[in-house]
Amino acid sequence: MNIKRLAASGVMLAMLLTGAVMAHGETADFGNPADFKTGMEENFYVQEGSFQELDTIKMASQGKLMSCFGNNAGSVYTVFFLPPAPEQDYAIGNPQRGWADEAPTAIDDPEIENYPANPFFSPAGWQYKLRQDEALVLFTGLPPQCKYYSFINYILFTQEKELKDYTGEKAYFRVGNQDIGLYHPVFGSIGSSIHAGNVKSTDGSPYGSQAVIVISANQTVTDTVLAQLKASGFSEDVINVMTIPAETYRMGLEKGKDTFAFLGRISQPESQEDYDAYIANLKETSTVYRVTPKEEVADALYENETLIPRGTGVHEAASLPRVEGHLDEMRKAIIAQYADEYDYEELTGDIAVPEGLTAYTKDINSLGDNRDTSYLMTRDFTLNSDEDFIVVYGVNHTATGKAQYSNAVLYSRPMLNGICSVYDSLFTGSAEDYLPEDCAEADSYYVYKMARTQMDDYTGVIEYSTGNEKGKFYGADNGATLLMAFRAYMDETGVGPSYYEIVYDRTIVFHKK
C-alpha cells in the first residue's frame, strides 16, 4: 500500500488501512496487514493483489468484457485482481481489442519451467487458478448501510470436455487455446456467502466496520494463516473463513485446471454519498494477499459445506387470502386497459439458473448464481416500436416476508446486460388501480411498467443502445432480443426463498397494433 497516497487522501483512509477504527469509543481490535505479510514471508510467498469494483456494463461497452453474466442492474460488483501464482506464466492479452496482458508474478525463477497461464479473459486478473495449498487473505472495510451485500467464491471457467459439442448450450462461449486448455464458463457459486447477517467484524456492526476473509482449500494452511493473523493483532471475532473443497474442483496450476473468482455485491445503499466514497476508495482501503507456501503442503482437505436449505415450509400464498383471484383481477384489468390498441403476449417465469455445484456437475453456465436469492426468467421477446412496453406484476415478496428485497430486471441478449430494474421499494401503491377498492392487501401486490417514456408514476424507462452516451450496453434498441428476470433476496432462513414457496412473477408484453 502507498501510505503517502493514503495520507493525502485523508485521515479516514489511513484509519481504515491501519485498523484504527473507533467503535463506541474504543479502538477496534484490528491489526496491520503489513505485519501479517512480514510474518508469513518466512515460509510463504506473499503477493499483493487488489480488491475493487468490476463495472460490468461499462467494461462491456468498452469492449473489455465478453459477457455481463446477467448483472443485477442497480447493484455494484467487486472482485479480486490477483497476480499469477509463483512460477506461473501470465496471460497474453489482445492489444487490438484493448485487452491488456495479465500482470506477471513477482516470483519467477528463470531456471524453473513455468506452469501455463490462466486462460485470458478480459479484464485480466479477476479469474485465477489456485493450488490446493494456497490461501487468499482479504483485509477490507465493509459496505455502508444498505439493503444487501455479500461476498462469494466462484468456479468461473472449467476445461471443455473432449468430444462434447457445446454450441447448443445457453450462455456458452470459449476462452483459452490448445496450449493452455480450452475453457468455458460455469460461474457457479462455491458454498455460502458472507453477508450482513453472518459477517464477523470489528465492532459487531455489519456496516462500515472492518473484517478479514480467509479463503483456503487446505486446513493446515488455514491454521497457519489464522495463527499469523492473531500474532499480528487480529482478533478471532473479525476473521471469516471460506473453504473450497479441493476434491470437488480441479485445483492446481497445470493445463486444464479450473479457474476461480471472488465476487462482492452491494445493493441499494442508504446513503449514496457514503456508498460512492466506499467504492471510490475501496482499492486503497483494502488489501488482498495471495499466499503460496515455498514448499508444497500436503493435502488437508475440506469437505463440501453443509448449506442452509431453502424453505420454511410455508407457501407465500398462505399469507394472502384469494391470491389467485387477486392476480387474475390484476391480469384482466391490465389487459382491459390496453387491449383495444395493443396486441399482447403473456410470459411466465421459470427457474433461471441452477445453483453452483449443480451447474458444475452439469457442465453448464450458472451466470454467477447466488443462494441468497431466487432467480426466475421468462422466454425471449422483442419490443418492435417505441410504443411497445412491458408490464410486470405479481406478489410483492418483501411485503409477504419472503424477501429482504426483490426486483425485476430487463435484460438484452446475447450479452445478458441488465438495462432496466425496478425494486420493491417502488411498489407501494402500484397495484391499487388494478384491484377492488376494498382489497386490504393491495400493497402485497405490485404492477410496474417498463417503457421508452414515462407512462405514469410506476414506470421504469428503457434506454436505447444506439447513441447512449454512457455506453451501448446501458440500453437496447427496438428489435433486440430481451427477457425479464426476477429476484427475491433472503427470507427468514438467511438464504433465498424456496422456488416452491413463492408465487411466480408475471409479465405481459404489449405491442402497438
Question: Language-model segments: which ranges?
Answer:
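A compositional/structural signature for long, glycine/proline-rich flexible linkers
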Residues: 25-513
